[in-house]
Amino acid sequence: MAKTYQCDPLIDAFLDDLWSSKGLSDNTLSAYRTDLRHFDRYLQSQGLRLRDVGQADVRAYLAYRVEQQFARTSSARLLSSLRRFYNYLLQTKQISGDPMAQIESPKLSRHLPDSLSESQVDRLLAEPNVDDPVECRDKAMLELLYATGLRVSELVGLTMEQMSLRQGLVRIIGKGGKERLVPMGEMAITEVEHYLTSARHELLGHIQSDVVFPSKRSQMMTRQTFWHRIKLYASRAGIETELSPHTLRHAFATHLLNHGADLRVVQLLLGHSDLSTTQIYTHVARARLQELHQQHHPRG
């Protein structure tokens, strides 16, 4: 009979520390939990515990992941989780040496985020029927997402007190508890105002909620539900580009850079703590400029 997996208590202690000291989002904490539990399961199958691990054990686990054909990006994220976890154990004096000290991350090719052209965005945003309460909500969400570059988790969790239509701003508490103010833009303000006055009350019914964009059940919408809504409108618009929940966030950043926005301004709007995270969008913008040059320059 297979032995039931018992999660090492060190994992929960680490996650509790992250939650209380760093203010990380539930999604980030969930990713850490998934990574650490996978490593812990492997160790237990080898008769090892998390606190007894050496560099050879980590390397053996990485070799196992290669054999199991895990993606390099997945292993890179896992190594980041392990580094933070073992640094916590070191700082709290639960281990005497860091098994991650000489472990290198796999080299990754810089993946350009999937994005949409400006004409594709126009087609996508034109699809929702604003006479229908659900699609009126979706129209406002799409316009706001493209205007602000919010993460989908930030959009679906948006509350009324975070938004000032008079000032045209949304106040976001992003990763690590960092606050940022993001301009909404006139078109997004118009669509959100229309939604608030004509459709939101129909979705809420008699339920009181501070959530700006409730689901049909008057609850906070999930990221997965909104992703499915995006794919629905993309299909109706005849857009065949592979979409992700962050497609409009990527389009927001790329289109700003295409129109001459300063990289550090885009960094602030996106809520990136590291400029290098934002810089990948310059590659997207540059690729688009090269494409336009080849299409339209007489010697392209």
Swiss-Prot record:
CDD domains: INT_XerDC_C. The keyword Cytoplasm applies. InterPro entries: CB, DNA_brk_join_enz, Integrase-like_cat_sf, Integrase_catalytic, Integrase_recombinase_N, Integrase_SAM-like_N, Recomb_XerD, Tyrosine_recombinase_XerC/XerD. GO terms for cellular component: cytoplasm; Holliday junction resolvase complex. Its main location: cytoplasm. Residues 111-294 form the Tyr recombinase domain. The active site is at R151, K175, H246, R249, H272, Y281 (o-(3'-phospho-dna)-tyrosine intermediate). Keywords: Cell cycle, Cell division, Chromosome partition, Cytoplasm, DNA integration, DNA recombination, DNA-binding. Pfam families: Phage_int_SAM_1, Phage_integrase. One of its GO terms (biological process) is DNA recombination. SUPFAM superfamilies: DNA breaking-rejoining enzymes. One of its GO terms (molecular function) is DNA binding. It is found in: Cytoplasm. Forms a cyclic heterotetrameric complex composed of two molecules of XerC and two molecules of XerD. Belongs to the 'phage' integrase family. XerD subfamily. Site-specific tyrosine recombinase, which acts by catalyzing the cutting and rejoining of the recombining DNA molecules. The XerC-XerD complex is essential to convert dimers of the bacterial chromosome into monomers to permit their segregation at cell division. It also contributes to the segregational stability of plasmids. This is Tyrosine recombinase XerD. The gene is xerD.
